[in-house]
From Swiss-Prot:
Belongs to the EutC family. Adenosylcob(III)alamin binds at V207, E228. Pathway: Amine and polyamine degradation; ethanolamine degradation. It comes from Listeria innocua serovar 6a (strain ATCC BAA-680 / CLIP 11262). Pfam families: EutC. This is Ethanolamine ammonia-lyase small subunit. It catalyses: ethanolamine = acetaldehyde + NH4(+). The lineage of its organism: Bacteria, Bacillati, Bacillota, Bacilli, Bacillales. GO terms for biological process: amino acid metabolic process; ethanolamine catabolic process. One of its GO terms (molecular function) is ethanolamine ammonia-lyase activity. InterPro entries: EutC (IPR009246), EutC_C (IPR042251), EutC_N (IPR042255). It is found in: Bacterial microcompartment.
């Protein structure tokens, strides 16, 4: 029995079972269940944009105005609430978001476009990547022979002042503050008939790298603007380390430091004016750090 005969036999059996009526079997089309999907153009709000100083999560506080007044004095996480022994979901999410911002700032780099826009002289320490930078701080203080020649060729020998910008532990700090603080420093220096020319930008920068730059350039004063280690309050805080005739291996006490430079701390414009005054005092007294007091 071939396939055609088998097919005819099956059709005959089906005809007998249906009472002799021949029916054309048509596969039933699947029914469509219509599900309307609503697509919105909205976006999830950025939880990090909420001003912690104005946020009070305590329900029905006894002195709401007093609580908010206290919060205006500090970015600390006051006025939180809980569910049993645990923080509320919003508080946990904000904590994790701020921590993520801090991590991103450490592992990201200052934009190359910004370095070009500001006409910085780019150099790199002996660190090859972020992992080596974080695990080998000693390499972040030194330059190889090639970088030494780049610094020597692009700076004025024995200048009164050499400005250095370093990414440090926060690229966000440099990108947020450098455009405001440099003009402020330059303007402040004009009051003392001082100026600076080419600015060195150090990638994978540790603070003592300014010491080797001081020895290479022979500058009287070296001022390093560097990103601070970010915290949960801000990732945009920058510091200025200033030293008179820095040398490799010198004591940390010879550095003068201005920290917490950002919009929520010491504004960069205000810090720039103070830095200019400090530089003038160092040149006048020929010292820095604790010796300047």
């Amino acid at each position: 029995m071939n396939e055609q005969e088998l097919k005819q036999m099956i059709e005959g059996i089906l005809t007998e079972m249906s009472g002799g009526k021949t029916t054309d079997t048509v596969a039933a089309a699947p029914t469509k269940s219509v599900v309307e999907t609503v697509v919105t153009e909205g976006s999830i709000p950025d939880i990090t944009e909420v001003d912690i100083k104005k946020q009070l999560l305590v329900p029905e506080p006894a002195d709401r105005e007093g609580y908010l007044k206290m919060k205006q004095m500090t970015p600390a996480r006051l006025g939180l609430w809980r569910a049993g022994p645990r923080y509320k979901t919003e508080t946990i999410l904000r904590f994790r978001a701020d921590h993520a911002v801090a991590q991103d700032s450490v592992f990201s780099y200052v934009s190359e476009d910004l370095v070009k826009e500001m006409n910085f002289i780019p150099v790199n320490t002996k660190c090859h990547d972020k992992d080596e930078y974080l695990t080998r701080p000693d390499l972040g203080r030194e330059f190889d022979d090639e970088m030494v020649e780049v610094i020597r060729a692009n700076t004025t020998k024995n200048a009164k002042l050499q400005i250095v910008v370093g990414d440090g532990l926060s690229s966000a700090a440099i990108e947020a503050n450098i455009k405001d603080i440099l003009p402020s420093i330059k303007q402040g220096l004009k009051m003392y008939n001082l100026d600076f020319d080419n600015i060195i930008f150090v990638k994978h920068c540790r603070v003592p790298s300014m010491d080797q730059i001081g020895e290479i350039t022979g500058a009287d004063v070296v001022c390093l603007l560097v990103g601070e280690r970010p915290g949960l309050v801000t990732a945009e805080s920058m510091s200025a380390y200033i030293a008179y005739k820095p040398t490799v291996g010198m004591p940390e006490a010879r550095r003068t430091v201005i920290s917490n430079i950002h919009s929520g701390g010491t504004p960069p414009v205000e810090a720039g004016a103070y830095i200019a005054e400090l530089i003038h005092n160092m040149l006048e007294k020929k010292c820095s750090g604790i010796d300047l007091k």
